[in-house]
């Protein structure tokens, strides 16, 4: 869809600018995805509620609708960011694996984010809604619980 291509083009333009300032470091790629996702799909739960009030709870609404309306919540941002990383992977800019992870914490709620794993197994979290981009093993305790059950053994070492 046109909306996705526009956001991807914005990302590539930002990458060119960032490469002139910061070089080709890998972290700047993740930072660019983080920033373009936030800019292209600002977090706005109230606007999302207004946009979806006329839809039945089981109705699927396309992501490009939220991009066009410039409003999303964590799941929309995670989907867009993962799409951008997959596109970068397909075009040869990165070579790790990308997923959208989510969980629910009792009495707190659910949340979704992007997980990127490098070929050597280093895990990065990109979470525009919670304002975080960085390594899983460097996350402070006040952050969301991003670890998968199999990550816990590795993180305790």
Give the label of every model feature segment.
Residues 2-64:
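Secondary-structure boundary elements
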Residues 29, 33, 69-85:
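Active-site nucleophilic cysteine motif
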């Amino acid at each position: 869809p046109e909306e996705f291509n526009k956001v991807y083009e914005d990302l590539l333009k930002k990458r060119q600018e960032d490469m002139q300032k910061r070089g080709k470091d890998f972290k700047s790629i993740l930072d660019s995805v983080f920033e373009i996702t936030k800019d292209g799909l600002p977090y706005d739960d109230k606007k999302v509620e207004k946009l979806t009030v006329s839809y039945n709870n089981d109705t699927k609404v396309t992501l490009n609708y939220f991009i066009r309306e410039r409003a999303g919540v964590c799941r929309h941002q995670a989907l867009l960011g993962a799409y951008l990383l997959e596109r970068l992977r397909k075009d040869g800019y990165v070579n790790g694996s990308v997923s959208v992870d989510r969980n629910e914490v009792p009495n707190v709620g659910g949340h979704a984010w992007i997980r990127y794993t490098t070929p050597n197994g280093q895990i990065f979290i990109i979470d525009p809604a919670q304002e975080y981009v960085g390594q899983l093993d460097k996350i402070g305790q006040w952050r969301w619980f991003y670890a998968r059950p199999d990550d816990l053994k590795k993180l305790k070492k």
